[in-house]
Structure formats: C-alpha cells, structure tokens
Regions:
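A conserved acidic beta->alpha catalytic loop
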Residues: 17-25, 72
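Short, structured coil segments at secondary-structure junctions
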Residues: 9, 30-32
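Catalytic donor-sugar/metal-binding loop of nucleotide-sugar-dependent glycosyltransferases
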Residues: 127, 148-151, 160-178
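Short, Asp-centered acidic motifs that coordinate Mg2+ and/or phosphate
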Residues: 64, 92-93, 170
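Short, well-formed alpha-helical segments that are part of the catalytic scaffolds
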Residues: 1-7
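Acceptor/aglycone-binding surface of glycosyltransferases and processive sugar-polymer synthases
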Residues: 34-55, 76-153, 179-202
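Short beta-strand-to-loop acidic/aromatic patch adjacent to the donor-nucleotide binding site
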Residues: 59-73
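Residues at the starts of beta-strands that form the adenosine-phosphate
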Residues: 11-13, 169
Length: 208
C-alpha cells in the first residue's frame, strides 16, 4: 500500500497501528512514514482521529488530509480526482463512492451499504450513494473541525453528522474498491456492525 502511494507521488504518509498483534508497527518504522501506535485496539474511528490530530500537529497548515484504508482495498490512483474539489475550494470534504462507477461490490455488502445510506438519509437528511467508505479528502477547515468520538465503525455515521452540523460543502467522487478473500472474510461480521452503527445513530439522535 505504501509503495503504491509513493509511486503516485504521495510521500507524507501516516500509519496508525491500532493495537495489532502482528509486526505492522515494526515494519512501518522501517518505511518512509510517520508510524503511530495504539497499545490497545480501539477501532477505526479512534485510529483516524489519532492520525488527523497528529497531521495537524506536525503540519499546522496541510493542503488537505486523505484517509486511506491500509488493507489494499483503496487505489492510490483515485486520490487525485478525490482531492481536486477540495484543493480547488469547491468542497470541504470529498467522499469516495463505490456506486458512482462500475461497481464490483458483493451483493450482501451492497445491500448493507445501501441500507446504511438510506438510514443516513432518514437521520441526517443527506443522501449519499456510499456513506461508509473510508476513502475521503478533508480540507484544512474540515480537518480542524472534525472531532471523532466514536471509536469503531460507527465513526463513518458520526462524520456525516458532523458534515450536516457544521454545514460542510461536500461532493462524491467515483472510486474502485478491490475486494480480496481476506477483506470479504472480515466483512462477515457486517450485520453485527450494522446493528452497532444503528444503535449509535439512535443514541446520538434521540438520547444524547
């Protein structure tokens, strides 16, 4: 993944090891990246906030911040198109969408994602074709305002809630996601995660 980013001209890379038990952090420290580590597994939302906070600390005036999955699902080739609206001042946040181009999303995951998008619309009034995609580009303004408090997968819904509350301008850009046997196997817990996300959305909307 890092080599692919380097090949596309991206070199200011932050890797957040979210308490993994393998050699991810050790390997990352040997590569030309900023390697950060959570000593306990906290979840993707926590890892994103750690990385964004670090980026703003090290570079108080970044042109933009990209969030990019480290499992090989995202293509570095999609970053330029994703970042263009933000760099041109046309959007505060640019969101990658698997459903604006030829989609190779497996059926079960497609149903889950479309259901999630519908719930996002019901709760927040924003219609997005792909509400839970990890490939995003944030402007400096959005990066500073973002404060993710949901540690796990429900962070994607929280980001959209923040978009609505802060009145960020946004756009969706077509991307291609590569699914491997490993990433599909990890997706088998998707129903449980979906219920967790729904419960969190209800709590934030009606109880908090």
């Amino acid at each position: 993944v890092i080599q692919g980013l380097n090949n596309q001209g991206f070199h200011n890379i932050i890797v957040v090891d979210d308490g993994s038990k393998d050699s991810t952090f050790t390997v990352a420290t040997t590569l030309p990246v900023h390697a950060l580590k959570h000593f306990a597994n906290r979840g993707q939302g926590a890892a994103l906030q750690t990385g964004i906070t670090y980026a703003l600390t090290q570079h108080p005036q970044p042109t933009a911040i990209i969030t990019f999955d480290a499992d090989g699902q995202h293509r570095p080739e999609d970053i330029t198109a994703l970042a263009t609206p933000v760099l041109e001042g046309k959007a505060d946040i640019s969101l990658g969408s698997r459903f604006l181009s030829h989609s190779n999303v497996p059926l079960i995951r497609r149903i889950t994602l479309k259901t999630g998008a519908f719930l996002i619309y019901l709760f927040h009034g924003l219609w997005l074709t792909d509400s839970h995609n990890g490939l995003r580009c944030l402007s400096l303004h959005a990066s500073r305002e973002l404060d993710i408090t949901s540690d796990r997968m429900e962070h994607a819904s929280e980001i959209i809630e923040i978009m609505k509350t802060k009145k960020w301008t946004y756009t969706e850009i077509p991307i291609i996601v590569h699914y491997s046997t490993n990433t599909l196997q990890r997706g088998h817990g998707g129903l449980r995660e979906a219920f967790r996300v729904l419960a969190r959305m209800i709590w934030r909307k009606f109880i908090k």
